[in-house]
Amino acid sequence: MPSDRQKKIRNFSIIAHIDHGKSTLADRLIEYTGLISQREMQSQMLDNMDLERERGITIKLQTIRLVYKAKDGEEYYLNLIDTPGHVDFTYEVSRSLAACEGAVLIVDAAQGIEAQTLANVYLALEQDLEIIPVINKIDLPSARPDEIKTEIEDIIGLDASEAPLISAKEGLNIEDVLESIVKNVPSPKGDINAPLKALIFDSYYDSYKGVIAYMRVMEGQVKKGMKVKMMATNKEFEVVEVGAFSPGAIPLDSLSAGDVGYLAASIKDVRHCRVGDTITDALNPTESPLPGYRKVNPMVYCGIYPAEGEKYEDIRDALEKLQVNDAALVFEPESSAALGFGFRCGFLGLLHMEIIQERLEREFDLDLITTAPSVIYKITKTNGEELMIQNPANMPTPQEIRIMEEPIVKTTIMVPNTYVGAVMELCQDRRGEMKDMQYIDDTRVNLYYEMPLNEVIYDFFDALKSKTKGYGSLDYELLGYRASDLVKLDILINGEQIDALSFIVHESKAYSRGKGMCEKLKDEIPRHQFPIPLQAAVGNKVISRETIKALRKDVLAKCYGGDISRKKKLLEKQKEGKKRMRQVGNVEVPQKAFMSVLKLDN
């Protein structure tokens, strides 16, 4: 039987497409319940990384406890768990949804439902959550709330007749949302007297208290001084502090079934506190862990190397600290002839990669070089051995390879029908294979494509946005591997192969990518005293070449008029010298050249 206290708890999260006003609504809810005075209020209250505020996106999960006095005169505890909306962070969304009983679905009154909205709704439905649709941005002149209501009913199948119409920016009708949460979200179930069972849905590292786990207590209760055990790693810890966020950390005596809060237990290593793990009482453990958590596998890899004057150890320390907060980041040491010692890092997607790079540069003040992102390829050698390759440098020679397969993703692209042609062209250009096309309503279309992940991770998202004036949206999931004509493209500078610039590319694109890289390098590498050939090669065959001309002294300056043979002699002598120089000279490739080539779009 749920206790009286449990009846007053509502755990919910907010799901929305990027930019539909999720963090703004969270700010308004905080303001409305009087948790923070107007003076202390800042926008995107829950996005506490500078980077999140700057890009206006939510990366890490946040949680906050609101106290709301409802119209029925009762006080309710509303635990808001904020979720990221970007496609790279789908796993984080699924974790926060598992900690809730309900979800507020925000739909933009002008733009309507987008691909990411749908993807998150399906995640919420899988967890059996009560979904409350809310229509935001009704203050916009282009808002069309009634059409959006029917759209929600037609596409998702939710009853939206009573959906609150709000403007989070203007603070309109915020109370309706709170009332709707109190009324529609079920209160948590769970026996307070059962053995402790709590779900970790996020963690971060505090330099004083060690790893702090954000958790939702499902059954039992957790108190200070209790011994707890992590079920995935079987490690035991003594609880030093438990509490809730409101918005800063507020220590409490205990958290019981239904509560959302945090736990500190002097955990030194984040790997002992896996997101999605179950915490239980070490002396009286629960029988089975909570279902549904998997280890996240990186989809995109790239090399991170120290730039001039940076130390390898500093990067390792920084990566370890980031890994504390980011269970999805993996890294291992590697070395490259061109760049020295560095790390091979795995990420969930390109946005995740950019964010980690920016955090390394900002929070740890490091200067980095990153190599071109690549995915994991599956290679079957002629002797039957199977390899998984994510670094082009480890690729066997073409003679040894029997089949080479690349990861394929199933993409769902939602676009206004005026842009269908442009998007289909883009997908074909990226080697996409059309599987299906569905009209959602008279204005929008869902396109289903199977595409190589390699083509999606570069800049597909940006290209899609520019082709659709920002209205296209994308969601993708991994399907599996498929054989493909892939080749390894090497870049040779002055006849020497530069391993950091090698990458794996589809045969049809090898020439254009190789030519593009050579041209870019030609602009970036300073001229030397001898001519430098830049070549792009596949195997032993050079497919493109540029030459950086030599700097030369004007050896004829001292000859006035005079005999041609004298001039010839001087020019020949200079030519000989340059030739000798070219054999012994080595080319300095500035780091700027690496950076600009690796940022090479399309």
UniProtKB/Swiss-Prot annotation:
The keyword Flavoprotein does not apply. Belongs to the TRAFAC class translation factor GTPase superfamily. Classic translation factor GTPase family. LepA subfamily. Residues 7-189 form the tr-type G domain. Pfam families: EFG_C, GTP_EFTU, GTP_EFTU_D2, LepA_C. This is Elongation factor 4. It is an enzyme of class 3 (hydrolase). It catalyses: GTP + H2O = GDP + phosphate + H(+). Keywords: Cell membrane, GTP-binding, Hydrolase, Membrane, Nucleotide-binding, Protein biosynthesis. It is a peripheral membrane protein. It is found in: Cell membrane. Required for accurate and efficient protein synthesis under certain stress conditions. May act as a fidelity factor of the translation reaction, by catalyzing a one-codon backward translocation of tRNAs on improperly translocated ribosomes. Back-translocation proceeds from a post-translocation (POST) complex to a pre-translocation (PRE) complex, thus giving elongation factor G a second chance to translocate the tRNAs correctly. Binds to ribosomes in a GTP-dependent manner. One of its GO terms (biological process) is positive regulation of translation. InterPro entries: EF-4, EFG_III/V, EFG_V-like, EFTu-like_2, G_TR_CS, LepA_C_sf, LepA_CTD, LepA_IV.
